[in-house]
């Protein structure tokens, strides 16, 4: 069985819902479908929550009424049978009455998660009703019955697997199994959500749990590209990526995929395909354990980086010095992206400057501290094992006219990173594309 995940834009209108239905039933084989809320709905639900936090029930009710009117129009556009329209209207009436009930109660973060969850609950019910109207044997599985996080707010794969198995057995023979893509319960049974990776993560976890043949992530983009099309003048789709290459690109700025979401698929050895609902026949990108030896796949960039350098000839070589430095960053929950050391100094980069002042003050105990802001990490991704000669020279040649603050290689065989000024980002990405992909 394949798992197919569709984001908010893919189910953003009644017409898109109809087209998604055609896509998932095209093969005639059973599929497990994961849906997000209709585009714009989650923002409205967050707006409702904001009003309630501010003790403004009138503002919340205004947004609820506006959202209800929007969905009333969707019902008329989506369904052809009066019976289905009536049943869906009744369902929506209950959902919006539920939202209004929060305007009369004490409001906390727990209630906010329940409110935000309604977006996916509404979209999945609307789509499953449409499928049934079309004569499709579709079953709606409530994600709150099997998706759970543990006490560390991390997904609980064993629980998901154990809960899903009997649920699927009870509904054996269905053509489409449909569920929500963001919501879950926490270890205490409360409504919660998968904060990192959202519905992509859910699709990957479900794929692992049911030993899926393939996990498909459908968006409005033709998979991964070899550079950022918003910055450079030419890009091409990347048709094949190793799991590690995809993780590097996701971490360093490729917005199409969250770095955590492919981990379950990687561990289970299940291919992930990135496909485009607007162009379903496009090849897209396949992510798997396959390596294309010695090939550079793509370039990505990460903005809003801060570089920190500690210079201390007295302390650097002292036992435990680096441990003390790392403990400072850990105490402020600030991750280090890049690190380089020498006999008299250590340079690091971070992407979270929320506690920069406190971190710098503590680092000054150990030496002279220099901070550079408005930096950018540019990374070249591919099969870059040290035995593959020449990729370093190629990248450095492309950056020969651009000041490079740091270079990082060796922590991964799939990435070489350069820290540059943000103002040089466009030129760096363009030069790397010209040199590596288009031989200009």
Question: Which functions belong to the PLM regions below?
Answer:
Residues 283-440:
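A conserved regulatory-domain signal marking ACT and ACT-like small-molecule sensing domains
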Residues 3, 10, 32-33, 177-179, ...:
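Structured core elements
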Residues 242-288, 292-314:
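A conserved active-site cap/scaffold subdomain adjacent to cofactor or substrate pockets
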């Amino acid at each position: 069985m394949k798992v197919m995940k569709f984001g908010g834009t893919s189910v953003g209108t009644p017409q898109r819902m109809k087209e998604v239905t055609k896509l998932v039933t095209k093969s005639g084989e059973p599929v497990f479908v994961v849906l997000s809320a209709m585009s714009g709905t989650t923002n409205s639900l967050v707006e409702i929550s904001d009003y309630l936090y501010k003790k403004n029930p009138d503002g919340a009710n205004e947004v609820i009424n506006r959202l209800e009117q929007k969905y009333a129009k969707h019902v008329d556009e989506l369904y052809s049978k009066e019976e289905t329209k009536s049943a869906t209207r009744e369902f929506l009436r209950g959902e919006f009455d539920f939202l209004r009930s929060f305007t009369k109660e004490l409001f906390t973060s727990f209630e906010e998660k329940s409110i935000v969850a309604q977006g996916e609950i509404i979209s999945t019910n609307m789509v499953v009703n449409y499928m049934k109207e079309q004569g499709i044997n579709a079953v709606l599985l409530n994600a709150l019955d099997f998706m759970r996080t543990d006490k560390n707010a991390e997904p609980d794969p064993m629980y998901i697997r154990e809960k899903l198995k009997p649920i699927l057995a009870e509904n054996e023979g269905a053509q489409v199994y449909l569920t929500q893509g963001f919501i879950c319960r926490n270890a205490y049974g409360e409504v919660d959500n998968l904060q990192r990776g959202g519905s992509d993560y859910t699709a990957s976890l479900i794929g692992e749990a049911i030993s899926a043949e393939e996990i498909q992530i459908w968006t409005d983009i033709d998979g991964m590209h070899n550079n950022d099309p918003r910055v450079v003048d030419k890009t091409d789709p990347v048709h094949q990526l190793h799991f590690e290459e995809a993780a590097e690109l996701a971490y360093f700025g490729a917005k199409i995929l969250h770095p955590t979401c492919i981990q379950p698929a990687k561990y289970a050895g299940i291919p992930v395909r990135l496909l485009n609902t607007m162009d379903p026949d496009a090849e897209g990108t396949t992510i798997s354990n396959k390596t294309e030896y010695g090939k550079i796949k793509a370039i990505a960039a990460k903005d809003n980086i801060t570089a920190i350098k500690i210079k201390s000839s007295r302390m650097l070589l002292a036992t435990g010095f680096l441990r003390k430095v790392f403990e400072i960053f850990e105490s402020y929950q600030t991750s280090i992206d890049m690190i380089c050391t020498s006999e008299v100094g250590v340079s690091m980069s971070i992407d979270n400057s929320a506690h920069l002042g406190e971190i710098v003050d503590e680092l000054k105990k150990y030496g002279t501290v220099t901070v550079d802001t408005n930096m950018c990490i540019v990374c070249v991704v591919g099969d870059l094992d040290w035995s593959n000669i020449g990729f370093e020279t190629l990248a450095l040649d492309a950056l020969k006219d651009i000041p490079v603050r740091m270079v990082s290689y060796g922590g991964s065989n799939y990435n070489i990173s350069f820290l540059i000024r943000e103002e040089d980002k466009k030129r760096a990405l363009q030069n790397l594309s010209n040199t590596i992909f288009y031989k200009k």
